[in-house]
């Protein structure tokens, strides 16, 4: 309920739902956070959710010794709104376009690092800028992207090969067919409604590596979740 519910209320509710269903957790407390012109505002705290907030959820569940890692994006509608502002939708669409390239180009390789470079060649050819974590460029005409695909399965962040900046050693592992990975990215797109500050859109869902690219393990979400 806008104006009443806090971020930690949502996080605890999600945890309760996991326990009720007999599911484990990949990361203990889910991360429920708000993103604004200054970046991440608050995470799973007593911050009250307001209309116009852009919400992100990062969590994972466990079942039969299999663990997931996923993200979702939601927007709290203002009075009279029936959809997210066009600038936020554009930022989300840019993130989807970047993810589509990742999905098509991540394939088995001698090392995960080799697969990463092939993927980035395609991403940059598609007009996306390679950025450092949470350090987007000042160029309002480009969408900056940070990628973090990593293994999943035995845990939310698994023990296998990784294309993520935070697992440099695992970039040296062979990326084989059948490897389970999360397709994770953060896309930063300029938002005129925020004075040109860039919107941080995180996307993450789980997939299996094949010779055709990667295939989703389940139907993935392709829209901003609208909260009334």
Model-derived features: where do they sit?
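Active-site neighborhoods and metal-handling regions in enzymes and metal-associated proteins
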Residues: 1-228
């Amino acid at each position: 309920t806008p104006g009443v519910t806090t971020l930690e209320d949502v996080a605890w509710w999600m945890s309760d739902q996991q326990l009720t269903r007999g599911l484990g957790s990949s990361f203990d407390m889910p991360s429920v956070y708000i993103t604004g012109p200054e970046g991440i505002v608050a995470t799973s705290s007593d911050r009250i959710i307001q209309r116009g907030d852009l919400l992100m959820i990062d969590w994972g569940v466990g079942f039969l010794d299999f663990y997931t890692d996923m993200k979702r994006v939601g927007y709290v509608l203002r009075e009279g709104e029936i959809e997210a502002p066009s600038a936020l939708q554009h930022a989300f669409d840019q993130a989807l376009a970047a993810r589509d390239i990742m999905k098509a180009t991540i394939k088995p390789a001698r090392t995960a690092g080799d697969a990463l470079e092939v993927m980035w060649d395609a991403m940059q050819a598609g007009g996306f800028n390679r950025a450092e974590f949470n350090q987007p460029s000042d160029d309002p005409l480009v969408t900056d992207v940070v990628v973090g695909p990593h293994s999943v399965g035995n845990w939310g962040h698994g023990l296998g090969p990784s294309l993520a900046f935070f697992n440099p050693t695992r970039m040296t592992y062979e990326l084989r067919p059948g490897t389970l990975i999360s397709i994770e990215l953060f896309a930063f797109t300029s938002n005129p409604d925020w004075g040109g500050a860039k919107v941080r859109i995180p996307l993450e869902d789980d997939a299996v590596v094949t010779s055709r690219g990667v295939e989703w393990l389940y139907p993935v979400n392709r829209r901003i979740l609208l909260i009334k």
